[in-house]
Amino acid sequence: CKKMVGAYFEGELCADACLKFKGKMCPTARTSPPSRPSSTSLSSRCCSIKSLCKA
């Protein structure tokens, strides 16, 4: 999962969250570190690959 999304998403936030929460949770403004920019589009892109993270 991390290799697959790491190059696609900036900062690998989605890949890290995917592995940490096993695809059960998507990063949002509340769950992302304050030093990294967050947006609803980032969250929706992360959620679209959720099924890949459950493997």
UniProtKB/Swiss-Prot annotation:
Q: What is its main location?
A: secreted
Q: Which UniProt keywords apply?
A: Hormone, Neuropeptide, Secreted
- Pfam families on file: Eclosion
Among InterPro entries, the record links this protein to: Eclosion
Entry's Gene Ontology cellular component terms: extracellular region
Superkingdom: Eukaryota
Per the record, the GO terms for biological process are: ecdysis, chitin-based cuticle; neuropeptide signaling pathway
Compartments annotated for it: namely:
Secreted
Which GO molecular function, any one, fits this protein according to its record?
Answer: ecdysis-triggering hormone activity
Which purpose does this protein serve, as stated in its record?
Neuropeptide that triggers the performance of ecdysis behaviors at the end of a molt. It triggers adult behavior patterns: larval, pupal and adult ecdysis, and plasticization during the molt.
Similarity remark: Belongs to the insect eclosion hormone family.
State the protein's name. Eclosion hormone
Organism of this sequence: Romalea microptera (Eastern lubber grasshopper)
